[in-house]
Amino acid sequence: MTTATTNPSTYPNAMAVARYVGISASKARRVIDLVRGKSVEEALDILRWAPQQASEPVAKVIASAAANAQNNEGLDPSTLVVATIHADEGPTAKRIRPRAQGRAFRIRKRTSHITVIVESRPSREGRRGGAGESAGGARARRAQGSKAAAAKKAPASSSTKAATTTEASEEAKGGSQ
């Protein structure tokens, strides 16, 4: 079911493959799209509560890839991310369903091959050390600048609006001309 390997990548990784899984590839892809790019812990939590039947075999393959990373590659399980995950079509078994008046319909029992590659990436908190705070600081400074500019413009426009409103109300009352 599983194979440990290292693909050429910038991060250390491990791989697991489940072949001939008794679910169609299109149904497996519905579940796979939920967890692509997530951390392994988050992906397993999502799959634990997903109602689709394909969530169980996909969760098994992700757990197997995480175990391969920890045991074979010596990677920290808390830093693992589902980097690549895909489902390919496997062989299709054909069966016959008898129908009325001597007819028969074909049943296609589809299988799939599910491949998962997990990478050990530094946590988001660790990556934000210097560059993230400067970007956040720049964003805060831009926001303050735009707030200050809006505050300078706001009183002028509100006083103009107030004068226009006063003139309109005076005319409506039939006041000074």
Curated annotation (Swiss-Prot):
Region feature (Disordered): 118-177
Basic and acidic residues: bias regions: 121-130
Keyword rRNA-binding found: yes
MF terms (GO), sorted A to Z: rRNA binding; structural constituent of ribosome
BP GO annotations: translation
Family to which this protein belongs: Belongs to the universal ribosomal protein uL22 family.
HAMAP family, per database record: Ribosomal_uL22_B (MF_01331_B)
Described purpose of this protein according to its UniProt entry: This protein binds specifically to 23S rRNA; its binding is stimulated by other ribosomal proteins, e.g. L4, L17, and L20. It is important during the early stages of 50S assembly. It makes multiple contacts with different domains of the 23S rRNA in the assembled 50S subunit and ribosome. The globular domain of the protein is located near the polypeptide exit tunnel on the outside of the subunit, while an extended beta-hairpin is found that lines the wall of the exit tunnel in the center of the 70S ribosome.
NCBIfam families: rplV_bact
Protein name as annotated: Large ribosomal subunit protein uL22
Gene name of the encoded protein: rplV
